[in-house]
Amino acid sequence: MKTLLLSLVVMTIVYLDLGYTLKCHESENLDDHVVCEEDETMCYKFTFVPFRDFEIVARGCSASCPEEKDVVCCSTDLCNK
């Protein structure tokens, strides 16, 4: 009986995909965040400075880290501050 219950628990976890979902900031307002899609395992922060003393920051989820100069990636919840 115990073996049957253990098997059912394992099957439930496998089939329901109780996996971890990443949360990333997505705007200038650090109180806002988004739950990433299953294939998006990285948070990114892209900083663009078109003019002196003027900065544009983009944040969000990504499946991989772009190899751009001003992109910082991380893989824990809300790490892209």
From Swiss-Prot:
It is found in: Secreted. It comes from the Eukaryota. Pfam families: Toxin_cobra-type. Keywords: Disulfide bond, Secreted, Signal, Toxin. One of its GO terms (cellular component) is extracellular region. The keyword Cell membrane does not apply. Its main location: secreted. Residues 1-21 form the signal peptide. InterPro entries: Snake_3FTx (IPR003571), Snake_toxin-like_sf (IPR045860), Toxin_cobra-type (IPR054131). Disulfide bonds join 24-43, 36-61, 65-73, 74-79. Expressed by the venom gland. GO terms for molecular function: toxin activity. The keyword Iron-sulfur does not apply. Belongs to the three-finger toxin family. Short-chain subfamily. This is Three-finger toxin 3FTx-Oxy6.
